[in-house]
Amino acid sequence: MRTVGVEEEFLLVDADRSRPIPAASRALRVATEWGVAGGQVGAGALVHELQEQQLEIYTAPQVRMASLETELRAWRAAAAAAAAAVGARLVASATSPVAVEPHRVRSPRYDRMAERFGIVTDEQLTCGCHVHVAVGSTAEAVGVLDRIRVWLPALLALSANSPFWQGRDTGYASFRIQALGRWPLSGPTELFGTAAAYQELVERVLAAQVVLDQGMLYFDARASHRFPTVEIRVADVCLDVRDTVLIAALCRALVETSAARWAAGEAPPQVPAVLLRLATWHASRWGVSADLLDPMTARPLPAAEVVGRLVEHARPALRRSGDDGLVADGIARILEHGNGATWQRDVFAGSGRLDEVVSALALVTSGGA
């Protein structure tokens, strides 16, 4: 069975005022003293992200979703404890509900990004959930990328958890995706066809000397340049760990299904990237609270129907992994109660205060509610 690893990015907010604070370096020094910072390939870790108001965790590769959930909870607890030691709280929201002025982590790479991309780097404070699923070769990875691309907007809709930006309601379920769109390379991709074509594209992109390196291929899904995985990057960081595990289970099933179809010589869906951009924008705008676009036709359908088609497409793989029950329960929960964006807006409707939203987010992130 394919292994799965997850990266989650979080905000750091002041424990008293619920405002994002530049505390990552201090929290990581504490974590280093505790022996939980840094990390090696094949092991989980707590690390820096672009801004000082962020921390990132990543898990070791796991086979069982129960083990993945246990590790995610453990790393969230470790990150929350390190944050608390420096007067901060950990928040699982893909954007900051309250106004924030990001403070960039000082590193040569991030300094070069700031010099080249200006305000885009300065204002970039978003938190995603990236799922790594093992593949056997670059050829298989590209075959998978060509076949999962049509399903990624539905994953975004399920995970959407960023309705607020700089102190206002954006109207979007995932404004993180809109913010990411300011980078040169982000969002859906065209069909690649072969590993050679994928590699040629990467080489041409790097030769253009616009992005710094392969790490800046911010596609919704890509072949990882660090690990033998497909990295699915479309999802917002989820408030509820169970939703993170749901997204991970769906990602693995999509990769397994797509790899099998690639191996059998089945052609990928011939959907132009422009239609996938429409579907992604629509999922970003509405999440699961309205229609989604049909993956094959780009016609609007009820969100539950599109998500149901995703599950049906991946059902044999879900059954083989034993994740079908987990996925059914998770999707039913989100369709009934909403995603993280719904939850944030419900809290704001009850309190009228965005700092109360942040405080409530921190409580749930730390497992207190």
Curated annotation (Swiss-Prot):
Disulfide bonds: none annotated. The keyword Nucleotide-binding applies. GO terms for biological process: modified amino acid biosynthetic process. GO terms for molecular function: ATP binding; glutamate-cysteine ligase activity. It catalyses: L-cysteine + L-glutamate + ATP = gamma-L-glutamyl-L-cysteine + ADP + phosphate + H(+). Keywords: ATP-binding, Ligase, Nucleotide-binding. Belongs to the glutamate--cysteine ligase type 2 family. YbdK subfamily. This is Putative glutamate--cysteine ligase 2-2.
